[in-house]
Amino acid sequence: VKPHVVFATPGRLNDHLDKENFSTAAIATLVVDEFDKCLEFGFLDEMQAAVTRLPALKRLMLTSATDMESIPQFIRRCAVADRAGVRTVNFLGEAEAREERLEVKTVPAPQKDKLETLARLLSALRGEPAMVFVGYRESVERIRKYLVSEKFAAEAYHGGMEQDKRERALYKFRSGCCNVLVSTDLAARGLDIPEVRHIVHYHLPANEEAFIHRSGRTGRWDETGNVYIIVGPEEHVPEFIGEAAEWNVDGERINPVSPAWVTLYIGRGKKDKLNKVDILGFLCKKGGLTAKDVGRIDVADRFAYVAIAARKLNLLMKNIAGEKVKGMKTIIQPIKQ
């Protein structure tokens, strides 16, 4: 294999190197994203092993959203550092500029159980994408179940879920098929989710780092964003959050806004030589849709997800009943909440 770019965890990268799945002769750059988190998770030995096995390495870049107290000795002793030295490029100034684009508000909850306050807050956001951060997996499931019972389009995301269910939840949120993602801090790092307008801290962040990473899901690049901290009757806003205006949501509760898109499941994928163009063509020619009625399309090995304009779903399902996709019989059905 001659890849241009290899994405892997430290352990998986070493596995590739052990099996000689690709040549290391031309690998000049190694980027370790979330370097501080890799150390926290105990990947020090794996990272050290990978660095020492790349003889042509010219650039070693370590990225972290928070300032690092020290750089491990193996980095300072590696051949790249010996030749070029270690240099820190600090983008904290840009982070401060982003903070100016974030509006932080506290939302008082009259009861210890904040569910009703959360529902009122999300209703006031009128269907704009929102991520709700909580401290425990069990809380994610409980809150998501409550929100669904209150007619919100909400999905759960945490480390206890199977990978395919996590990926489906992310797809639905990214594509606009759901507008609320309830998650542990697992979603605070490493996910590219554009246009998240609102971050809700249902449970107070454990520390400043958690607050930064959670809140960093909004206000990205040149966008603006809103951060809400729900504060219970016995809670106090941590000092590291700084000044925040108070927003009371005790007024009349607004009915939740339903997403404009729904998720369609197609039981064929890349292994069946099905691609995005095939899917779009099928939906338009057989389903009677226009390109504007079709949103994000994700094609996996054995299946595909497609965002369909909710107002056109019934027409689509009627038109494609019994139809084949690229000559293949398959299951085509909307994914329920």
Task: Give the location of each predicted region.
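Post-DEXD/H (motif II) to motif III coupling segment of the RecA-like Helicase ATP-binding lobe
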Residues: 15, 21-95, 235, 240-243
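Conserved segment of the helicase C-terminal RecA-like domain
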Residues: 180, 207-249
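Walker B catalytic acidic pair
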Residues: 10, 33-35, 136, 195, ...
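Conserved helix/coil segment N-terminal to the catalytic DExD/H
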Residues: 1-29, 37, 44-52, 166-175, ...
